[in-house]
Amino acid sequence: MSYVYETYDAGNGVEFHPVALSLPADARGEVTAYFKAVDGVFAVGADQTGATLPMYAYAADAAPAQGSLGLHFKPLASVLSLTIGEEASKTISKITLEPVDPDGVEGHLAVSEAVVDPRTGAVTVGEDAAVSDILTMEIGEMSLVQAQTVNFLIASGTKVDGGLKATISCTDGSVFVKNLFEGQEVAFAGNCVGAATELFFRLRIATYEDMVNFAQECADDNGGAIVDLQADIDMRNVPWTPVENFTGTFNGNGHRIYNINVSADGRYAGFFAYAKGAISDVVFGSKDGTSYDGTSRIELKYSADTDTWCYAGIVAQSNNTLTGVTSFVPVTVTADSRCKSRTGGIVGSLYNGKMSGCRNYGAVSNVATAGVASYVAGIAGIVDGSGDAAGAITLDGCHNHGPVMTSLGLGNAVAGITASVMKTAVNTTISNCTNAGEIRFDNAGTSAAHRIGGIVAYIVDSCPTLVIDNCTNKGTVVSNMNGNCFIGGIAGVNYAAAIRDCTNEAEVKFVQANAAGAGYLCIGGIAGQTYSGAKVTGCANRAAVSSDKLQVTRIGGIVGTHNASTIDDCSNSGDITLAYTATANNWEAAGGIVGFYDGTDGTAVTNGCTNSGKVWATVNSSNANIGAGGIAGIIKSGNATNNTNDGAVWMHNAQAGKSSYAGGIVGYDYNTKDKSAVTGNVNNGAVQATVEGTSALLAAGGIIGRNDVGAVSGCRNFGAVACALHAGALVGWNKKSVEDSAAGGSVNGTALTGTNYAELAVGFQDGGSSSGITFGEK
């Protein structure tokens, strides 16, 4: 506060004119007079501190004594004293005040420059002054281990009708919002304390009525409380309107909320509609904390149109932190819903949020008959973000135990943990999560692209910063739906993300009893399809992977379709089965590690992997591209290096005269794009290729069944090879090169020895070459 003063009456009088008003007050809340008055007399040596309440002074009508000057001091501004009550483990960094109704302000909350009439106190705003109706106090750090009071200075003459909104930002990222003086008119007339109020962030809920009041507070834009749940709450099966605009901290303290009834013909179906803050340590849908209460439900039935995104979950849409949240509540998108939907057992949509230690036991399903897109998952429907590289989204230690299902036949993804991770969800980590619920598509009469995963169904476009780490699937993953289908024990479709140290322990299958379908099927024990630099490292599949679908099929123990990505140090011990008898003209590829290497986007690599599962393919196809291998069924573009197969491989084609290729490492290397490398691999498994009747397109090899363009080197075979036409200990039918490899095992019952290995190493040299071949014995 600055003053200009003028003397008059030969120095016997002085007028003070304040010309600047600096706001807000000191963050510490200290308020003292800028110039102290002592016995009504202005003392030149008065205290002038930086923590001040601006004052103005004017001469008294009469001097109190000869030779002295009488002055009146009055506050230039009013103080809004805000006490943040009760203890909380929070540290405040910033407080913002603004009117609830921007049109309800007379004057201005903050003025940078003004002139004050010394007698009346009337404020005239300077011509170049900056004015604002938003006050921001940058505090830095203020602990709330005990109640604190801060003081804001409000320009004299200001009136606010409708109340003020206080926004408290904390150092941990949480934000609380609270309305002050709601529905009141507050006048700041130059009093020392124009208004004072307490802001209690801690709200205690012990009864149903308390919960109703809490929901109303949030609806009134007072959702910034620290909520302590102090008892189990029976929601009485009364229709519940989802809590809106919750921005605070909800401490469940291990209590339960049960008999929940949400059936929303709106965009948000959940106990909470939208939450930004933190929710922790609370159980929904259980009276005893261990089982479903039998009545709770959350239903989304938005029937207005098909082009609107809707959300369903305990928290329908979340931009917050959820810790230790458990749900037994069934979450359903109903048959009469028509919207696009994102549905999760805990969260419908997780946006820039964090989840840890959350569990779902409730069934999650979408049985709508209309709508153009659906994401359904046991924990979070989708994971999305702002695309800001500085952010981090995490799901850690979350577990789904409930079945997850959709029968909607359009644009679908369904998974145990999250149905989809969007490309804007930068720096997302999904770690230490488990799915134990069955994951199912159930609509045999519909054809549409769909993705299914035990952990994640659809990693969209390119997510190079996404990591799926140490996750396990224990629930069966199954579909019977037509169209392009991507099924994986861990992930359905993986664009560019890293999947590492994950395990699938449950069957992955497509079941449709020889029904014909268009499109192609990619099915893997870990991932249905990998693209664009995706990495699968240190993963294990321990369960059967199978299909009886009459469709183009790429089926593998680890990955179904492998394109421009890498698979390192993975293992498969589950049996791989492709079985149909009806006639078709489809590509068919089955492998212990990879079904099909696709060359669309670039070279794919499989390195250091081991298969011990049986690869068993029976088809009825007139297509030339038919292959089964201990490591890969068919290679179009890519390399297989340093892998080991211990499982039996059998390919049978029920069409006479058609193709059937089987290899201990690769069934068919037809690579139309560039030369592939098959190096350093070892086969110990039995290999057999058969066809109904006879065929000129029949080959089996210990390393490759039919090799059109592959460079085979440094490989060893010790397995038994059987084929009625072209059979070789290393390659059955060779059009390229075989070098520096060891031939052992047997061919059509003849054991290889040091004298016959050379003639049995390659079954048919069709313009190819071989050199450096040695006898292989263990």
PLM regions and their residue ranges:
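Short, low-hydrophobicity acidic/polar segments
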Residues: 1-91, 138-141, 145-151, 156, ...
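Residue-level detector of short, conserved catalytic/binding motifs and their immediate flanks
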Residues: 31, 78-80, 164, 225, ...
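Residue-level recognition of well-ordered beta-strand positions that form the cores
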Residues: 34-36, 83, 96-98, 167-169, ...
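Acidic Ser/Thr/Pro-rich low-complexity disordered segments
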Residues: 38-49, 103-131, 177, 287-292, ...
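Short helix-loop boundary/capping segments
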Residues: 72, 80-146
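Short, surface-exposed secondary-structure junctions/capping segments
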Residues: 123-134, 190-203
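Surface-exposed repetitive/solenoidal architectures
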Residues: 202-778
